[in-house]
């Protein structure tokens, strides 16, 4: 791409005058800047990419200038450009151009050491190694002895029961899902497990409809006598109550009539019966079906 000279508008521009803000060819540049000494001091930037000389920064006069600020009309290096155009929002809005022939590349950013490093072999071993808590030697020996004793008890088919004193402990046979397997009476099991506060005849009254063979089988224990006495008392109460505890509404028969209909069979025991007086002849029969003797004819 070629830039046309702003003065003659015919030749190719070779320099850019920062003071005049114009692109000039070699002929126009010599003609304009040779007129007086003041014009000869104008800063001019070559537009040819093959130019080997790079002008210095107008601020520090040490580093090479890469940026041209249109408002300040000065060539600036990177350091001076940042220092000047970051003071306030007004100067940061200045238009700046990159000089011709300057190649721009991405600046490598040093990110520094990574905060999250890859896990080392030591970290991996620490993650995979299980946590083991150190146990004192006496406690460890006691724990091993207790664990070994529990294994032996499980192999023998017994489970530890309640402790009678500090040295000895009772052992109960294993209980299956159905019933107990062993010769220990039921009352001993209830005392061991603290079930003596319950009613001892609860199971017996629950199974009251079973056969008498269960009662004779429970006669071996001391509680069977209490169960039998409770059964006898229950039978006496049933006999006194008539054997039935259901409620019934008493039925009152219809009142008797003069014709003998609806007369009770045992009216002298009936509390509701009121006899009807129909004639002067005294009634001596005990039932309504009894016939009164015929009157004798008088001759």
UniProtKB/Swiss-Prot annotation:
<feature type="binding site">
    <location>
        <position position="60"/>
    </location>
    <ligand>
        <name>Zn(2+) 2</name>
    </ligand>
</feature>
<dbReference type="Pfam" id="PF00643">
    <property type="entry name" value="zf-B_box"/>
</dbReference>
<feature type="zinc finger region" description="B box-type 1; atypical">
    <location>
        <begin position="5"/>
        <end position="47"/>
    </location>
</feature>
<keyword id="KW-0677">Repeat</keyword>
<dbReference type="InterPro" id="IPR049808">
    <property type="entry name" value="CONSTANS-like_Bbox1"/>
</dbReference>
<keyword id="KW-0010">Activator</keyword>
<feature type="binding site">
    <location>
        <position position="80"/>
    </location>
    <ligand>
        <name>Zn(2+) 2</name>
    </ligand>
</feature>
<feature type="binding site">
    <location>
        <position position="85"/>
    </location>
    <ligand>
        <name>Zn(2+) 2</name>
    </ligand>
</feature>
<dbReference type="InterPro" id="IPR051979">
    <property type="entry name" value="B-box_zinc_finger"/>
</dbReference>
<feature type="compositionally biased region" description="Polar residues">
    <location>
        <begin position="251"/>
        <end position="260"/>
    </location>
</feature>
<dbReference type="GO" id="GO:0005634">
    <property type="term" value="C:nucleus"/>
</dbReference>
<feature type="binding site">
    <location>
        <position position="57"/>
    </location>
    <ligand>
        <name>Zn(2+) 2</name>
    </ligand>
</feature>
<keyword id="KW-0805">Transcription regulation</keyword>
<keyword id="KW-0479">Metal-binding</keyword>
<feature type="compositionally biased region" description="Polar residues">
    <location>
        <begin position="277"/>
        <end position="290"/>
    </location>
</feature>
<keyword id="KW-0862">Zinc</keyword>
<feature type="compositionally biased region" description="Polar residues">
    <location>
        <begin position="164"/>
        <end position="181"/>
    </location>
</feature>
<keyword id="KW-0804">Transcription</keyword>
<protein>
    <recommendedName>
        <fullName>B-box zinc finger protein 22</fullName>
    </recommendedName>
</protein>
<feature type="binding site">
    <location>
        <position position="8"/>
    </location>
    <ligand>
        <name>Zn(2+) 1</name>
    </ligand>
</feature>
<feature type="binding site">
    <location>
        <position position="5"/>
    </location>
    <ligand>
        <name>Zn(2+) 1</name>
    </ligand>
</feature>
<keyword id="KW-0539">Nucleus</keyword>
<feature type="binding site">
    <location>
        <position position="33"/>
    </location>
    <ligand>
        <name>Zn(2+) 1</name>
    </ligand>
</feature>
<feature type="zinc finger region" description="B box-type 2; atypical">
    <location>
        <begin position="57"/>
        <end position="99"/>
    </location>
</feature>
<comment type="subunit">
    <text>Interacts with HY5.</text>
</comment>
<keyword id="KW-0832">Ubl conjugation</keyword>
<dbReference type="GO" id="GO:0008270">
    <property type="term" value="F:zinc ion binding"/>
</dbReference>
<dbReference type="InterPro" id="IPR000315">
    <property type="entry name" value="Znf_B-box"/>
</dbReference>
<keyword id="KW-0863">Zinc-finger</keyword>
<comment type="function">
    <text>Acts as a positive regulator of seedling photomorphogenesis and light-regulated inhibition of hypocotyl elongation, independently and in concert with HY5 and BBX21. Acts as a positive regulator of de-etiolation and influences chloroplast biogenesis and function through regulation of genes encoding chloroplast proteins. Acts downstream of COP1 and plays an important role in early and long-term adjustment of the shade avoidance syndrome (SAS) responses in natural environments.</text>
</comment>
<feature type="binding site">
    <location>
        <position position="28"/>
    </location>
    <ligand>
        <name>Zn(2+) 1</name>
    </ligand>
</feature>
<feature type="region of interest" description="Disordered">
    <location>
        <begin position="143"/>
        <end position="181"/>
    </location>
</feature>
<feature type="region of interest" description="Disordered">
    <location>
        <begin position="206"/>
        <end position="299"/>
    </location>
</feature>
